[in-house]
Each structure stands twice: as structure tokens, then as C-alpha cells.
UniProtKB/Swiss-Prot annotation:
Signal peptide: none annotated. GO terms for molecular function: biotin transmembrane transporter activity. Probably a biotin-binding protein that interacts with the energy-coupling factor (ECF) ABC-transporter complex. Unlike classic ABC transporters this ECF transporter provides the energy necessary to transport a number of different substrates. The substrates themselves are bound by transmembrane, not extracytoplasmic soluble proteins. InterPro entries: BioY. Belongs to the BioY family. This is Biotin transporter BioY2. The chain crosses the membrane at residues 12-32, 54-74, 78-98, 111-131, 150-170. It is a multi-pass membrane protein.
Length: 182
């Protein structure tokens, strides 16, 4: 029992570290930059189980909240987490947990895994755009233009990459560790 808890905590810390290392890398386009954050969240969600995924993302958000520069562009703090783009960050909890839970339910079958990852990434965009719209009080057209439309294609590509690499990683790890078996 102790080893299982320790292993789970280790996976949570490792998941948060992966997200934290990749998140500061960004390509600025508009108010919401294209980042490796969603790629990292998707990868963690694809490889880890829902509980570990949720807590890895929560730990990552807490690190940024307390001032460690782990958000896009090396930013951090309450103003980022609860600012105009904070909805995208908070949506990672929903995105990651949904992806992880869904993949476990379908036993990591390839085609459904692509669909689940794409839906998770698009759901994150919807939640983030809703937050952006209500936070900034812009009209729907502008909110979609700033937070959704420019990122749909990129997020679908990220979801496809995450599925390919994540499933390959799970298959490789399942030979050495029963955590990664269905």
C-alpha cells in the first residue's frame, strides 16, 4: 500500500514537472499564445490515470499560483491564473481528467483515443474562450476570434501528436510496469 501511494505521488510530481518544463515555451499569436502547455497536459493525461492527471495539473497550477514561473512565457501568479487567459489554464483540469478517464474507459484503443484527445483539447478551448469572453466583456465574435478560431487547427494537431506518442509510450511502459496496463 505504501509503495502504491509513493508511486502515485511520484507520477503526480513527474506529470507536473513535464507540464511546468514545456509550458513556458510559446509562439505568440494574438492574446492567447500557441504553447506546448496543452501538448504537455494532453501527454500527461494520455499516459497517467485520471486521479494522477488531475493532481499533476492541480500541482502545476499551484506552482504558478505561488509565483514559480511555470506559465506561458515564464509568467506566474494570481493575476495570470485569474486573468483574461486564466480560463484556459483552469480548463486543463477538465481537459486532462476527461482525456485520462476516457482513455481508460476505452482501454486505449487507437481511433477512440484520437477522438477523446481531440474532444478534450477542443473542450479546453471552449472553456477558455467562455472565460475570456466574460472576463473581458467582449462580444462573442471577438471572443471566438481571440480565443478559439486561431487555435482549433493547432489543438487538433497537438491532440493527434499526443495520441500517437502517448499510446506508444503506454505500450512501451506496459511491458515493464503494471500501472500502465489496462
Amino acid at each position: 500500500m505504501q509503495n502504491t501511494k509513493l508511486y502515485s505521488l511520484t507520477l503526480i510530481a513527474l506529470g507536473a514537472a513535464i507540464i511546468a518544463v514545456l509550458s513556458p515555451l510559446a509562439i505568440p499569436i494574438g492574446i492567447v499564445p500557441v504553447t506546448l502547455q496543452t501538448l504537455a497536459v494532453g501527454l500527461v493525461a494520455t499516459v497517467l490515470k485520471a486521479r494522477e492527471t488531475f493532481f499533476a495539473i492541480l500541482l502545476y497550477l499551484l506552482l504558478g499560483f505561488i509565483g514559480i514561473p511555470v506559465f506561458t512565457g515564464g509568467t506566474s501568479g494570481i493575476a495570470v491564473l485569474f486573468g483574461p487567459t486564466g480560463g484556459f489554464l483552469l480548463a486543463f483540469l477538465v481537459m486532462g481528467t476527461l482525456i485520462s478517464w476516457g482513455l481508460h474507459q476505452i482501454k486505449y484503443k487507437t481511433i477512440p483515443a484520437f477522438i477523446i484527445n481531440i474532444v478534450g483539447h477542443l473542450l479546453m478551448l471552449v472553456i477558455g474562450t467562455l472565460w475570456l469572453k466574460f472576463f473581458t466583456q467582449v462580444d462573442w465574435s471577438l471572443a471566438l476570434k481571440l480565443g478559439f478560431t486561431p487555435f482549433v487547427f493547432v489543438e487538433i494537431i497537438k491532440a493527434i501528436l499526443v495520441t500517437i506518442f502517448g499510446l506508444a509510450l503506454i505500450r512501451a511502459l506496459s511491458h515493464t510496469n503494471k500501472y500502465f496496463t489496462n
